[in-house]
């Protein structure tokens, strides 16, 4: 990770370093466009690496299942031939200029000049929605309360309460049921929101005694000493209380997101996203493009695979900005290989 402030000149500045950003860097390399990856996190990978490194992803083409961390490793191998610079651990604060001549400055003092910009910042700055429980911070400090599973093995033999009613809660309840002593799946409603196959697997694990469904209950209090959790107290809306002996609590109540400085860059925005032209992924500001979850347009699907396609489309559109007098002749990678 680069720590000293850098001054770089490049064809394309890519704001973000998640999977969509990494593939956009690959596409830039294939078109012989220089680029730099800039991210506030200390390592590449975005949410895949920071939040879900061991969570399987099922809709990446040619991979029946691949964990988030493994996907990032593969993408890093793919861009390795292009030796893409990375400015990590400091977010972009300001973006000024015009198409063909932009200047970006980070909080650390890095200065990047670029002919075009790709914003691949996911949902922007993100953080977990934390349950309003007294004394929560003490349990967060010890790891008794966690919002992201980085190492499933850490929960081996433990009693784990998984709170939430969506895909993340269901997926992690299933995954942890393979290593934990017991998983309690807590939701304030009787029904969960998930794919039929996932719900079927949940029922199988319930029948096997690996998961216990605790509904309709919601979190009420945590009990323990010095951040060591002993019981999770839950209640119904009618006030019925239950104490669950547990070693860990994993609340999956979604992420709170914020565009942060991006909202101050003069771009049209809509509900924490950047509207773009679907054919090019260009924003309201010529020369600034947005791809991945931060981009929006009619028919948009928030899928990694669609972000990959958007990265390719943006890179091809940018080629005309960087090389306005050179026609781009489309070639398949099988014909031209990877440029050296």
Swiss-Prot record:
MF (Gene Ontology): ferredoxin-NADP+ reductase activity; flavin adenine dinucleotide binding; NADP binding
Chemical reaction(s) catalysed: 2 reduced [2Fe-2S]-[ferredoxin] + NADP(+) + H(+) = 2 oxidized [2Fe-2S]-[ferredoxin] + NADPH
Gene3D superfamilies linked to this entry: FAD/NAD(P)-binding domain
Alphabetized InterPro entries for the sequence: FAD/NAD-bd_sf, FAD/NAD-binding_dom, Fd--NADP_Rdtase_type_2, Ferredoxin-NADP_redctase_2
Subunit description: Homodimer.
Family recorded in the similarity comment: Belongs to the ferredoxin--NADP reductase type 2 family.
Protein name as it appears in the record: Ferredoxin--NADP reductase
Native species: Gluconobacter oxydans (strain 621H) (Gluconobacter suboxydans)
């Amino acid at each position: 990770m680069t720590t000293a402030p850098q001054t770089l000149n490049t064809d394309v500045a890519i704001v973000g370093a998640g999977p969509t950003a990494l593939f956009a860097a690959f596409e830039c390399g294939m078109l012989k466009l220089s680029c730099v990856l800039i991210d506030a996190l200390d390592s590449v990978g975005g949410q895949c690496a920071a939040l879900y490194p061991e969570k399987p992803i099922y809709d990446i083409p040619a991979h029946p299942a691949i964990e988030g961390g493994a996907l990032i490793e593969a993408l890093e191998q793919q861009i390795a031939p292009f030796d893409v610079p990375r400015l990590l651990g400091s977010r972009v604060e300001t973006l000024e200029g015009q198409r063909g001549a932009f200047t970006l400055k980070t909080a650390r003092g890095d200065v990047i000049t670029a002919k075009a910009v790709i914003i691949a910042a996911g949902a922007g700055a993100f953080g977990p929605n934390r349950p309003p429980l007294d004394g929560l911070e003490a349990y967060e400090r010890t790891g008794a309360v966690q919002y992201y599973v980085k190492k499933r093995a850490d929960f081996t033999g433990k009693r784990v309460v998984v709170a939430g009613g969506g895909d993340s809660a269901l997926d992690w309840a299933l995954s942890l049921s393979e290593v934990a002593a017991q998983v309690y799946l807590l939701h304030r409603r009787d029904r969960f929101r998930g794919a039929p196959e996932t719900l079927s697997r949940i029922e199988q694990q319930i029948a096997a005694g690996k998961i216990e469904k605790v509904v309709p209950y919601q979190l009420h209090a945590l009990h323990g000493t010095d951040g060591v959790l002993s019981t999770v107290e839950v209640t119904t809306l009618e006030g019925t209380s239950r104490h669950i002996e547990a070693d860990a609590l994993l609340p999956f109540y979604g992420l709170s997101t914020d565009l942060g400085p991006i909202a101050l860059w003069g771009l049209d925005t809509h509900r924490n996203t950047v509207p773009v032209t679907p054919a090019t992924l260009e924003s309201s500001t010529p020369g600034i493009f947005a791809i991945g979850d931060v981009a929006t347009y009619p028919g948009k699907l928030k899928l990694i695979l669609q972000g990959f396609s958007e990265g390719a489309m943006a890179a091809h559109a940018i080629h005309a900005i960087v090389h306005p007098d050179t026609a781009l002749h489309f070639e398949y990678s099988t014909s031209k290989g990877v440029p050296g």
